[in-house]
Amino acid sequence: MTGSHLPALDAIRGLAILLVTLYRFRLGPDDGMWFEHVYTHVLSLGERGVDLFFVLSGFLITGILFDSKSDRHYFRNFYMRRSLRIFPLYYGVLLGCFVILPIVWPANIQYPFADARELQNWLWLYGVNMRVGWHNDWCFGSFNHFWSLAVEEHFYLIWPLAIFVLSRRSAMNVCVVFGIFALVARIAWLALGGNGLAPEVFTPFQFDALLIGAWLALAARGPGGLAALVPACRLAFPLCLGLLLPEMVLHQRWLTVPST
């Protein structure tokens, strides 16, 4: 398999967008009616759309890295392309909201990004998720969702080196080991009395979704390509559905651990 465009990935990306959008528009606490109860909890499942984004990102980035592994300027090309793709929009938003907007904002109208402005250093340094998780507080207002961008950026910093120095099979093993580590770390964190928000946003706790995508990308580049994964996917689908149903209907996860 090469880095050619896969239309199916656009459908997955669209599904992830739909899930997150539904989650944002879910109802508040229901009034006791059974259909409101189910409706609210089904839409709450849209939170898993972020995990789906992570899986897709891990798949795409790992594919790009593996396919360009023999390039002369492997690291330079990757980081330049990522920077040109991400930084102009990301830092453009921060400049607009924290530098330009305060200059022109009317003094008699409340500034809408005051909370985030006080903590903007975390935004400039891609540390939103660390601040949120450590203090157990969604404290960035309209910028709270930037936590997921921070997780991906941290992944981009370390994963290119892993792909460069490891064989395909070794990299797949790393995906499995550290994916399991992320799961166990979330459980251990809560078992040891850690706050409930950190497992949702801390970078080490979120690597399993990214590594699932990375593992799939590496497996797809082995003998048989994506077709070799079809039997495993047929088994995984009902298993995943069975794990999600309790959350959809009862709002209860099997392992009762965030993002697990």
List each language-model region with its residue ranges.
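Short, Lys/Arg-rich, polar N-terminal cytosolic tail immediately upstream
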Residues: 1-8
